[in-house]
Amino acid sequence: MKTLYVYADFDWLDEPMLVGELGYESLRGSDSYSFKYDNDWLRQYGSLYLSADINNYPGQQYTQPDRDIFGCFNDALPERWGRLLLNRREQILATEEKRPVRKLSSFDYLIGIDDYSRMGGFRFKEKQDGEYINCEKSLRIPPLTDIRALVAASMEIEKSEELNQLPEKKWLLQLVHPGTSLGGARPKAGVMNDEGRICVAKFPSRNDDYDVGLWEHLSHLLAKEAGVEAAETSVIETGKKYHALLSKRFDRTVEGRRKHFASAMTLLGLTDGCDAKSGNGYLDIVDFILQNCCDVEQNLRQLYRRVAFNIAIGNSDDHFRNHGFLLTPRGWTLSPAYDMNPTLNEYQALLINSTTNYADLQVLLDSSEEYMIGKDEAVYIIEEVKAGVKHWKSIATRLGIAKREMDVYEQVFQRSLK
C-alpha cells in the first residue's frame, strides 16, 4: 500500500491544512484506492463537499470496483496529451535502464506532476514532515519567451507518434514538467507570462487545417461581450502557420495563491462518456448549484447564459469536464468558462433540457423554468447573448482570421442569430 498525505492549500486558508490520506494498491493488475479524512479537517470543514465519491465522515473509504481514482484527484491528472508525455518518458527510461516498461496508473500520473502547476488547490506529501512532492525549483514552468521552442518540441512529439516511434529524449525533457499537469487532448504546456502569472499555452497541432487557437481566443472575446464570465485569453505567434492560445489560469490569485477547482464531472459523480446519450445534461448542473453552491440565483443565471452562448457559437464540446467550479468558504461557485470553440455540430454534448440536446435558442427559451429562470429574464439573457455575438465577423477580421475559415463557420452564427 502506497500512501500520500493530501493537503488543502486553498487561497482562503491561513496555511495549508491536512485533509486526509490517499492510499493506493495494485493487486494482479487491478488498482484500488482508499481515502481517510483527517479528524481536524472534518471538525472544521466537514460541511464542505469535495467529491461525489467521498463522504464527509471518519474512517476508510474505497473507490467502487469499476471506478479509478477518486474524482477530486482525477481533476488534477493529465489527460491524453500529458499522459502521452509521461508514458513516452517511461518507455525511454525503461530502455535506458534495460527493464520492462511499467504500465502507469493514475497514482503514477498524480505523483509525476509538477506541484507548482498542478490544477486546483491540493498538494501531496509522502511524509507529513516532508516536502511536497515535485516542488523543486528546477521544475518551475518556463517563461513565455520559450514558446517557440515548446511548440517545436510538441510538433516533434506529434511527428514521432505519426511514425510510431519513440521521440528523442530532448523533446520530452522540454515538455514533460510544464505539459503534464494539464487536461485535454491537444498539445499544451504551462508558461509564465510577462506579469509573472501562470498561463496555459495551447499549441497548434501538426494536423490542424485552421487556426484553432485564434478561434478559441475569438470565442472568449465574444463570451465576454455576451456577459459570460470567461478565462482571460490572448494569442501569440509561434513561428508556425497558426497561433498559440494563452489562457490565464483562473485557479490562481494575482498573488499566486491556489483556488481549489473541481470539474462538474467530479462534483456530480459522473465519468467520461456521461452526456446526452446517457441522459445527462445541464439540468444535472442546475441540481448541483441548488444543493451545493453559494449565490445560487447568480450561478443559475450565469449557467443559463453560458448554455445560450454555447448554442449561439456552436460550442458543442460542452461535456462535463468543460464545466467547472471554484471552492469558497461558503460553498462552490461557477469557475470562469473555458475551452470554448465553434463547431459545425447541431447538437450539444449535454442535454439542454430533460429531453433534447438540439442546439436551438428557442429550445433553451422554452426550457427556462427548468433552470429556475423566469420567461422575461430568459428572453433578456438570450437577447444579450445574441447582441454580444452578432459582431463576430468584424472581431474575427480584426484578429486576422482568414476569410475562408469565417466562411466555414458563418452558417453556425447565422443559424443562432436568425
What is the predicted role of each segment?
Residues 1-320, 324-418:
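Phosphate/dinucleotide-binding and metal-coordinating scaffold of catalytic cores
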